[in-house]
């Protein structure tokens, strides 16, 4: 029987753990702080930021949302990031993407203190992940959330085959690194991959993050596989759906994430978890 991986419940459990950690910090007069910088008025960004802000406050995390006009210059945005870098009440800094045209997003991310890089996108932290270095450092939230989900399954990853469809810096590439670090044999597919189905059918764990509605059909998966759908798409009727044809794929596999209610809740829960991580690590360094 197929296991439907309940991202909402796993996120709820993770949030409860995070709230407990926040309460313990507050007993020592330490409050984790998250700063989210939004430039322009992208409607989707506004929804994401509002959800992050509400969740942070609910868990007891200090949440600062800095809204800036689309006319903000590179220098002005960099200056604001640098101010949060030295603010002892802020432990995590997030610059909401996409940024308006004319702003260099990579340069802005690189300006964030790597020890406050709550999204795990700073080149130093990306390099640490890909080098599988020991130590405490933030990583990309969605892939980390997926690893948390996989840990709830009665499956050993070591030695198994994983295929990641998508090579973005936000999901695909860090996801492949985390699975490789878990001793899986990993392949990464993308828009130029030939004979995609031949590759995806080899996967014991298939992670799909393309933004292409129902790209993966029942014939594209290995029977008994675990399928993680990162897609958040709209079908022709406006219904929220994913990159995987859930109704037809689910009966063939051992476990699958639904859309909605799968990966989505885990991303914000992991962001909150990582904000508290950064606060605790800062305390251990004697910065609080």
From Swiss-Prot:
Protein name: Bifunctional protein FolD
Keyword hit for Hydrolase: yes
Subunit structure and binding partners: Homodimer.
GO cellular component, one term: cytosol
Keywords of this entry: Amino-acid biosynthesis, Histidine biosynthesis, Hydrolase, Methionine biosynthesis, Multifunctional enzyme, NADP, One-carbon metabolism, Oxidoreductase, Purine biosynthesis
Enzyme nomenclature, EC number: 1.5.1.5, 3.5.4.9
Its job: Catalyzes the oxidation of 5,10-methylenetetrahydrofolate to 5,10-methenyltetrahydrofolate and then the hydrolysis of 5,10-methenyltetrahydrofolate to 10-formyltetrahydrofolate.
Catalytic activity: (6R)-5,10-methylene-5,6,7,8-tetrahydrofolate + NADP(+) = (6R)-5,10-methenyltetrahydrofolate + NADPH; (6R)-5,10-methenyltetrahydrofolate + H2O = (6R)-10-formyltetrahydrofolate + H(+)
């Amino acid at each position: 029987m197929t296991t439907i991986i309940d991202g909402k419940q796993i996120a709820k459990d993770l949030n409860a753990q995070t709230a407990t950690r926040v309460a313990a910090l507050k007993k020592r007069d330490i409050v984790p702080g998250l700063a989210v910088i939004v430039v322009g008025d992208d409607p989707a960004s506004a929804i994401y930021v509002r959800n992050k802000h509400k969740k942070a406050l609910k868990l007891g995390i200090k949440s600062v949302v800095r809204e800036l006009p689309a006319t903000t210059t590179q220098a002005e945005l960099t200056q604001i990031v640098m101010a949060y870098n030295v603010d002892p009440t802020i432990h995590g800094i997030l610059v909401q993407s996409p940024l308006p045209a004319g702003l260099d997003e990579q340069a802005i991310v690189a300006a964030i203190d790597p020890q406050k890089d709550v999204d795990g996108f700073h080149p130093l932290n990306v390099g640490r992940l890909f080098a599988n270095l020991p130590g405490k450092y933030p990583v990309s939230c969605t892939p980390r959330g997926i690893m948390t989900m996989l840990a709830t399954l009665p499956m050993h990853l070591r030695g198994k085959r994983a295929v990641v469809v998508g090579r973005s810096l936000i999901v695909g590439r860090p996801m492949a690194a985390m699975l490789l670090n878990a001793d899986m044999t990993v392949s990464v597919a993308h828009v130029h991959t030939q004979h995609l189905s031949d590759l995806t059918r080899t996967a014991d764990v298939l992670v799909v993050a393309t933004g292409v509605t129902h790209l993966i059909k029942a014939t594209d998966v290995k029977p008994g596989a675990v399928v993680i759908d990162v897609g958040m798409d709209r079908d022709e009727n406006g219904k929220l759906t994913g990159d995987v044809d859930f109704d037809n794929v689910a009966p063939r596999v051992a476990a699958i994430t639904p859309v909605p209610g799968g990966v989505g809740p885990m991303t914000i829960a992991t962001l909150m978890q990582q904000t508290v991580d950064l606060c605790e690590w800062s305390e251990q360094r004697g910065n609080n």
